[in-house]
Amino acid sequence: MDLVTFLVLTLSSLILLSLWRQSCGRGSLPPGPTPFPIIGNFLQIDIKNVSQSLTNFSKAYGPVFTLYLGSRPTVVLHGYEAVKEALIDHGEEFSDRGSIPMVEKINNGLGIVFSNGNRWKEIRRFTLTTLRNLGMGKRNIEDRVQEEAQCLVEELRKTKGSPCDPTFILSCAPCNVICSIIFQDRFDYKDKDFLMLMEKLNENVKILSSPWLQVCNNFPLLIDYCPGSHHKVLKNVKYIRSYLLEKIKEHQESLDVTNPRDFIDYYLIKQKQANHIQQAEFSLENLACTINNLFAAGTETTSTTLRYALLLLMKYPDVTAKVQEEIDHVIGRHRSPCMQDRNHMPYTDAMIHEVQRFINLVPNNIPRAVTCDIKFRNYLIPKGTTVVTSLTSVLHDSKEFPNPELFDPGHFLDANGNFKKSDHFMPFSAGKRVCAGEGLARMELFLFLTTILQNFKLKSLVHPKDIDMIPFVNGLIALPPHYQVCIIPR
């Protein structure tokens, strides 16, 4: 048999196998566009704007439909009612983490974000308990964030009102809060280890959100057999893991079980106390992976939201003026903002909520998977099926938020100017997998933004109407375009 004949037979076999799997897999799944062999619906999706593609499909197939990403079926939920019904009303059945091949290669089933089953339940329970022990929701954590907010102000003063890219400085602040929780201590913004950690984390988020990584996740064979930026991610992860394991080793050598200092100490104590079954879940590798998850989730999401916020505040100076007027009235110029102030600052609270709604940071959520065969709206979704929930369709629902494509804090204010909650506000996801650090993120956004606006004016290098809001990258998360700002003392 010559090579050409062999290749033709191999390709034909793959196509037939793909067609057979798709026909068998369709079963009672929701409707959707007809997939091509092997590549599925990949060519019908705009990988630079997946959210819009999902919206277009929903118009044709309804709020629950099926796409084939490669040869694997993925059920998509579009609109508040479908998303709520799955994540909240059927939270347990939709509580597994869906497949992201590149992330699976990085985490190997470990950590708090991408693990499943008993391992995920154990590590999530431990993490939430430990964060509470370390002061989450209490004055202790608030003190740390306030301290970091003042350090942030000092760094911003050093720019002396000159044009600067705020990316690095705005990343340092939330990263240092996580450092204080994980390692007990914060880092100086010039510390070499800190700078390297920041660089690796930021680079990985950009690459993981790129169109190329979406291609790799749809066709996992590319990860092992093709060159590309994904190899840089793996190299960075290896560096971060090595750094974290060294920090863990230092903690092991100085551990006092009667006086835990930070997250690592609590974990090491838990490891010593764990029974035979739990010991498998509380390995040092799982600790390193969990810390990496906390850094990635706790640093990049908050810092990116802050970057978007400054960009929006420059584009809408009337909003900035109202926020600063409220800051001056409630807080003044001579004391640090605190969380109690938020109850008396409805416009500022509404502005921060509107930033999160408008930017739609994680457009399609992190994929879920069903834990068992489930009948959902007369469709049968088999156990293990990946489920994508469109947060864009919830946060930009015109029935809940009139003119959703406009930035308007009024979306979260009632007729009397009081803050108005919305069940559609899901930037942290919802249900069993809601972000474990939601409380910390809300605190950081309020304290960092109010402290910045208390001390500085924001000046754009271009006219406000010319400020570009189109995301630089719009994959796993939406990253804002690069910009410069003049941060001028008030």
Curated annotation (Swiss-Prot):
Keyword Lipid metabolism (UniProt): yes
Subcellular localization(s) per the UniProt record: Endoplasmic reticulum membrane; Microsome membrane
Cofactor: heme
Domain of life: Eukaryota
Entry keyword Metal-binding: yes
Any GO CC annotation of this UniProt entry: endoplasmic reticulum membrane
Entry keyword set: Endoplasmic reticulum, Heme, Iron, Lipid metabolism, Membrane, Metal-binding, Microsome, Monooxygenase, Oxidoreductase, Signal
Residues making up the signal peptide according to the UniProt record: 1-25
GO molecular function: arachidonate 11,12-epoxygenase activity; arachidonate 14,15-epoxygenase activity; heme binding; iron ion binding; oxidoreductase activity, acting on paired donors, with incorporation or reduction of molecular oxygen, reduced flavin or flavoprotein as one donor, and incorporation of one atom of oxygen
Membrane topology category: Peripheral membrane protein
InterPro entries referenced in this protein's UniProt entry, alphabetically: Cyt_P450, Cyt_P450_CS, Cyt_P450_E_grp-I, Cyt_P450_sf, Cytochrome_P450_fam2
Enzyme Commission code(s) on record: 1.14.14.1
GO biological process, one term: arachidonate metabolic process
Binding site for heme: 435
Pathway where this protein functions: Lipid metabolism; arachidonate metabolism
Induction annotation: P450 can be induced to high levels in liver and other tissues by various foreign compounds, including drugs, pesticides, and carcinogens.
Catalytic activity annotation: an organic molecule + reduced [NADPH--hemoprotein reductase] + O2 = an alcohol + oxidized [NADPH--hemoprotein reductase] + H2O + H(+); (5Z,8Z,11Z,14Z)-eicosatetraenoate + reduced [NADPH--hemoprotein reductase] + O2 = 11,12-epoxy-(5Z,8Z,14Z)-eicosatrienoate + oxidized [NADPH--hemoprotein reductase] + H2O + H(+); (5Z,8Z,11Z,14Z)-eicosatetraenoate + reduced [NADPH--hemoprotein reductase] + O2 = 14,15-epoxy-(5Z,8Z,11Z)-eicosatrienoate + oxidized [NADPH--hemoprotein reductase] + H2O + H(+)
Top EC group: oxidoreductase
Distribution of this protein across tissues and organs: Liver.
Function, in words: A cytochrome P450 monooxygenase that primarily catalyzes the epoxidation of 11,12 and 14,15 double bonds of (5Z,8Z,11Z,14Z)-eicosatetraenoic acid (arachidonate) forming 11,12- and 14,15-epoxyeicosatrienoic acids (11,12- and 14,15-EET) regioisomers. Mechanistically, uses molecular oxygen inserting one oxygen atom into a substrate, and reducing the second into a water molecule, with two electrons provided by NADPH via cytochrome P450 reductase (CPR; NADPH--hemoprotein reductase).
Family: Belongs to the cytochrome P450 family.
Annotated protein name in UniProt: Cytochrome P450 2C39
UniProt organism field: Mus musculus
